[in-house]
């Protein structure tokens, strides 16, 4: 295997020894419609319903040459290109071709591919040189086109966010890279709209305060201005502009997240059986969260299909929580969303909690780290930890939250 990336924690974005390929399929829905209906080729094609209140789902590049873009009202699109051809969405076909493309990349090039959406994904390498990376990206791109007739664009960087940005710069059917030492030359001249995570309000505020290029953000030293213009996202946006996208070591990543995964014994589980497996995995993970006296800021659910494609969805939570029901609802929602795209042919299920911090309502003695608490001598231990262990073991046998602490019942 050329490279693997197996952490469930989505906060990892950069590491000097890592290199990311970010795949973005070009006009994917429109390309699928053209493959299924060859008569649509070489015509301005819009995917969406031809009604005045609808919006453009996506369109091919010929339609884009008229100024049409995703999210545009259909009425406006028809003003720009009255001769446009329409195709209704066929999500089953989109999922089918998406799976084919990702499976081909994984199998042909012996890579572990992580899908982020139906038409975006990434692979991660360790110690791959930029020259070899570019050559490999072109080979992947060419192979997908020759075998399946799809164009994909690829961004390459030692930082995840930069790889994503430059996959968009590479469109259509290109490969572009940007490494840390190239940020001033390649990243700074780009308009700030290219930064992931900037909303319309932030963009308007940015223009009013003379932030037009990414370089304008990078050069700004006024933290107060940054906070006023970009809100809580100012720090991460500034880091991206500097090419310093949240670097951390593998050990740091592991310590800030906990995960439980299970490889399934059989490949023909029913939907109900998969739901039961998910609940069992969640219960084990939740017990670990309780016994570590921590709360989390987000959840990731990961599925590996029979063709070894890794699919994951994550959700950040507004407030830190260690609430069982809150976390279970999020996990099930993410799982069901993934299942719609992947189907029942599942090889592995994984769940993780990320963004961990100490839970102030836990019963651990103040100032004592978890590993110190576990390894403390009997005279130094309190009865709280033993009680938590007992509650955990009973609930493991008879169902979660059958036994709870009185203060938790009072709070609810």
UniProtKB/Swiss-Prot annotation:
- UmuC domain residues are 20-199
Return any one Pfam family short name.
Answer: IMS
Which Gene3D superfamilies is this protein grouped with? 3.30.70.270, 3.40.1170.60, DNA polymerase, Y-family, little finger domain
Q: Give the record's family classification.
A: Belongs to the DNA polymerase type-Y family.
Q: Name one GO biological process term.
A: SOS response
- Name-wise, this protein is Uncharacterized protein MG360 homolog
Q: Name one GO molecular function term.
A: DNA-directed DNA polymerase activity
Instruction: Tell me which domain of life the UniProt entry assigns to the organism this sequence originates from.
Output: Bacteria
The UniProt entry's GO CC annotations, sorted and at most eight, read: cytosol
InterPro entries this protein is in?
DNA/RNA_pol_sf, DNA_pol_Y-fam_lit_finger_sf, DNA_pol_Y-fam_little_finger, DNA_polymerase-Y, DNApol_IV, Rev_trsase/Diguanyl_cyclase, UmuC
Q: Which organism is it from?
A: Mycoplasma pneumoniae (strain ATCC 29342 / M129 / Subtype 1) (Mycoplasmoides pneumoniae)
């Amino acid at each position: 295997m050329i490279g693997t990336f197996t952490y469930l924690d989505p906060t990892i974005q950069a590491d000097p020894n890592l290199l990311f390929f970010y795949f973005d399929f070009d006009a994917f829905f429109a390309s699928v419609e053209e493959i299924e209906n060859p008569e649509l080729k070489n015509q301005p094609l819009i995917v969406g319903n031809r009604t005045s209140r609808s919006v453009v789902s996506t369109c091919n590049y010929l339609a884009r040459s008229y100024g049409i873009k995703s999210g545009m009202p259909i009425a406006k699109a028809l003003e720009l290109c009255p001769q446009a051809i329409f195709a209704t969405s066929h999500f089953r076909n989109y999922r089918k071709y998406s799976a084919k493309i990702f499976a081909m990349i994984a199998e042909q090039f012996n890579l572990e591919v992580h899908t982020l959406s139906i038409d975006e994904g990434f692979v991660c390498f360790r110690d791959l040189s930029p020259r070899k990376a570019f050559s490999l990206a072109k080979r992947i791109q060419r192979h997908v086109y020759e075998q399946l007739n799809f164009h994909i664009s690829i961004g390459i960087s030692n930082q995840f966010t930069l790889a994503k940005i430059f996959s968009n710069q590479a469109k259509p059917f290109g490969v572009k890279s940007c490494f840390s030492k190239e940020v001033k030359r390649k990243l700074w001249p780009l308009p700030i709209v290219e930064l992931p995570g900037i909303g319309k309000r932030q963009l308007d505020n940015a223009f009013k305060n003379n932030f037009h290029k990414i370089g304008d953000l990078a050069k700004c030293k006024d933290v107060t201005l940054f906070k006023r213009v970009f809100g809580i996202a100012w720090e991460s946006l500034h880091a991206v502009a500097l090419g310093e996208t949240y670097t951390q070591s593998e050990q740091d990543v592991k310590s800030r997240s906990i995960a439980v995964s299970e490889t399934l014994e059989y490949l023909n589980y029913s939907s109900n059986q998969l739901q039961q497996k998910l609940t069992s995995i969640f219960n084990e993970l939740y017990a670990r969260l309780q016994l570590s006296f921590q709360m989390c800021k987000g959840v990731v659910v990961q599925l590996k299909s029979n063709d070894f494609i890794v699919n994951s969805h994550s959700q950040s939570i507004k407030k830190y929580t260690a609430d069982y029901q809150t976390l279970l609802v999020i996990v099930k929602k993410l799982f069901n969303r993934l299942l719609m795209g992947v189907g029942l042919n599942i090889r592995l299920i994984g769940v993780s909690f990320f963004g961990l911090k100490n839970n102030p309502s836990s019963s651990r003695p103040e100032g004592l780290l978890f590993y110190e608490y576990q390894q403390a001598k009997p005279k130094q231990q309190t009865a709280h930890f033993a009680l938590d262990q007992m509650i955990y073991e009973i609930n493991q046998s008879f169902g979660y939250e059958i036994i709870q602490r009185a203060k938790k019942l009072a709070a609810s």
